[in-house]
Regions:
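Hydrophobic alpha-helical segments, chiefly the membrane-spanning helices
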Residues: 1-328
């Protein structure tokens, strides 16, 4: 048990370190291309900080563990929205732009609804009963993700100012090396992280789903947490908001899309990524978090996630964790 815990911590450390290198390198490249702060957060940083989730979920899918692959994403998005945004808002309220309210936040809600519909295969409406995300579903998700990335870059190109050029003086070759080194650390660390977490769960007779939506989800979301806290401290709320929205959308469309396509079922298991381990509470909390961000734009202070609303997000997360422990 002690050995597995040490491997788990070492794997997590590599994942977080790798993500840090990847984000720094990607941000340097993005700023040299003249992208706006929000678009950097939404795309490069958002997707970069989701790389741990990609490694963990893809590894789970390749090993035929659907609970790890699916639970990690559902848990990660819940952690991102309720805990990270809630905690970040406590540090400094997050202002929202008109585009955030009209386009970006609704896209997060739509993506979440798509996950529920595709994952449950319309069983909520009495049609179909396999509760899996098939390879075809995964391909559809990846096509939607490609369209989303194209739209984000096309609509978010910003003129590079002298100030931003002076601020980002890092060398391009160093940034590329950081990206490659970060990916290597993420892949190796993620593999060890999944193996040790699964072994610990089985030693303690704890379900893979519980481990996935708590330890794995929280652990792989550490890059998002660190990024958002630093962004809030530096008064870069748009970077923090873009990071979470981009991460959540990327988790669903890119990571679950790739995982569904690559999934190798174990003998006797469904042919697609099974959502049988997910309950209405899990998916309901996931959707609630997406809706709460949108609702906060229309409350008393308007287009701002303030400390009161951040506290509501944190209270919702605490309630969900309590429910998980009660139903362990």
């Amino acid at each position: 048990m002690v050995t597995e815990i040490l491997i788990l911590l070492a794997g997590l450390a590599l994942v977080v370190l790798g993500a840090d290198w990847l984000v720094d390198g990607s941000s340097t490249i993005a700023r040299k291309a003249g992208l706006s702060e929000f678009v950097i957060g939404l795309t490069i940083v958002g997707i970069g900080t989701s790389t741990p989730e990609l490694v963990v979920s893809l590894t789970g899918a390749l090993k035929g563990n659907a609970d790890i692959a699916v639970g990690n994403i559902v848990g990660s998005n819940i952690f991102n929205t309720l805990f990270i945004l809630g905690f970040t808002a406590l540090i400094r309220p997050i202002s929202m732009t008109r585009d955030n309210v009209k386009t970006d936040i609704p896209l997060n809600i739509i993506t979440t609804v798509l996950l529920i519909i595709f994952g449950m295969h319309f069983t909520l409406f009495g049609i179909g009963n396999d509760n899996t995300l098939s390879r075809l579903d995964g391909v559809i998700f990846l096509i939607l993700f490609a369209a989303y990335m194209y739209w984000s870059f096309k609509s978010g190109k910003a003129e590079e100012t002298k100030d931003s050029a002076d601020h980002e003086s890092g060398k391009l070759w160093v940034a590329i090396l950081m990206v490659l080194g970060g990916l290597a650390a993420l892949i190796f660390g993620g593999d060890k992280f999944v193996d040790s977490a699964t072994n610990i769960a089985r030693m303690l007779n704890i379900s893979d789903k519980f481990i996935a939506v708590t330890i794995l989800a929280g652990g792989t979301s550490m890059p998002e947490l660190v990024t958002c806290v630093v962004a809030a401290a530096k008064k870069k709320g748009q970077l923090a908001l873009g990071n979470i929205l981009g991460s959540n959308i990327g988790n669903i469309l890119m990571i679950l899309g790739v995982s569904a396509v690559a999934y190798k079922p174990q003998p006797g298991s469904p042919s697609g990524l099974s959502f049988s381990g997910m309950t209405f509470v899990d998916l309901g909390i996931l959707l609630l978090g997406a809706l709460l961000i949108w609702v906060s734009a229309f409350t008393r202070k308007g287009r701002k996630l303030d400390r009161v609303e951040g506290s509501i997000l944190l209270a919702s997360f605490a309630g969900y964790m309590t429910w998980l422990l009660i139903n362990l």
